[in-house]
């Protein structure tokens, strides 16, 4: 048995999702009495200049670089086994070796497709368990390596995709994607309506605009939706201060129809009272929506994992996918007027959601390494037994 194991969680700042999952896992380990947990942006620390450039290109994929990103995502998938793997496997290796030598972790977890650790295992024979926590409702080959001990995935659909490309089924566990604990709490909605000055007798449309211009024509959309009777529009601008200031002028014209916010710390509160939400199809956002059964309208998915996520939720009946700006208003208004469809989408979200994903992942990892949590017993004996 490993007493007080040290856990190293590797992540990357491409969007907020991977880091958020890493932090959620870190908090869950600490809640279970495992205090020695390190979160590291391996690529950012190893090659900050290259990382800044690639992050910039990633953000540009939302606006001017969609075709470029399509070629990258699907092109890498095709040639990955031949050329990319060797280069990518060694990216961040120097920093990684220093981390392993100095910190001496007992467990390594990846919330971003970093294969430097399993590749190092393969080349040097070091013995350290490696776990990959996939953060989308699809899989890219870049996540896969023979030296990864276990994969934690969102759904049985992802598991099937992985089995199809040769990953042994016993190495894959369906747990859901880790989300912030606030999304799994019981909250009195009356408190939320009062806090945000929302009306219980009206439908609420939540628009998550984001900080990087990923949702276009927000002001025009708000103007259109403000004319819809018995509807309140709530816009979360994130850290996009320019957008917030632009929309506040609209809010001043009709503060009952439009509510504008910047960064919202407890955004789960708005999820709980919204009738439906317009957003981008990131894996973490969709997992949070599933946890609270929020019907989603997915705005112009970027080719790659966003598009794969969107297609999955659309096929399950949990989402409406918008691929052209001209469709947003008409399709959203139609959905808001269709209570039967909204209820069906909520039920579809409920069928996708797996409760307490972070807890199940942490319990399973600790059980497999014979490092049971201090103070708190394992929540899922059945899951833990599958690792022994």
From Swiss-Prot:
Single GO cellular component term: plasma membrane
Which reactions are catalysed by this chain?
a 1,2-diacyl-3-O-(beta-D-glucopyranosyl)-sn-glycerol + UDP-alpha-D-glucose = a 1,2-diacyl-3-O-(beta-D-Glc-(1->6)-beta-D-Glc)-sn-glycerol + UDP + H(+); a 1,2-diacyl-3-O-(beta-D-Glc-(1->6)-beta-D-Glc)-sn-glycerol + UDP-alpha-D-glucose = a 1,2-diacyl-3-O-(beta-D-Glc-(1->6)-beta-D-Glc-(1->6)-beta-D-Glc)-sn-glycerol + UDP + H(+); a 1,2-diacyl-sn-glycerol + UDP-alpha-D-glucose = a 1,2-diacyl-3-O-(beta-D-glucopyranosyl)-sn-glycerol + UDP + H(+)
Alphabetic keyword roster: Carbohydrate metabolism, Cell membrane, Glycosyltransferase, Lipid biosynthesis, Lipid metabolism, Membrane, Transferase
- Top-level EC class as recorded in UniProt: transferase
- GO MF, any single term: 1,2-diacylglycerol 3-glucosyltransferase activity
Keyword match Cell wall biogenesis/degradation: no
Q: Where in the cell is it found?
A: Cell membrane
Q: Recorded E.C. number(s)?
A: 2.4.1.315
Q: Name one GO biological process term.
A: glycolipid biosynthetic process
- InterPro entries given for it? Diacylglyc_glucosyltr_N, Glyco_trans_28_C, Glycosyltransf_28_UgtP, Pro_diacylglycrl_glcsylTrfase
This protein's pathway reads: Glycolipid metabolism; diglucosyl-diacylglycerol biosynthesis
- Chain's role: Processive glucosyltransferase involved in the biosynthesis of both the bilayer- and non-bilayer-forming membrane glucolipids. Is able to successively transfer up to three glucosyl residues to diacylglycerol (DAG), thereby catalyzing the formation of beta-monoglucosyl-DAG (3-O-(beta-D-glucopyranosyl)-1,2-diacyl-sn-glycerol), beta-diglucosyl-DAG (3-O-(beta-D-glucopyranosyl-beta-(1->6)-D-glucopyranosyl)-1,2-diacyl-sn-glycerol) and beta-triglucosyl-DAG (3-O-(beta-D-glucopyranosyl-beta-(1->6)-D-glucopyranosyl-beta-(1->6)-D-glucopyranosyl)-1,2-diacyl-sn-glycerol).
HAMAP family with a match to the protein in the record? Diacylglyc_glucosyltr
Which family is it part of? Belongs to the glycosyltransferase 28 family. UgtP subfamily.
This chain belongs to which protein, by name? Processive diacylglycerol beta-glucosyltransferase
User: What organism is this sequence from?
Assistant: Bacillus cereus (strain G9842)
Q: Which gene encodes it?
A: ugtP
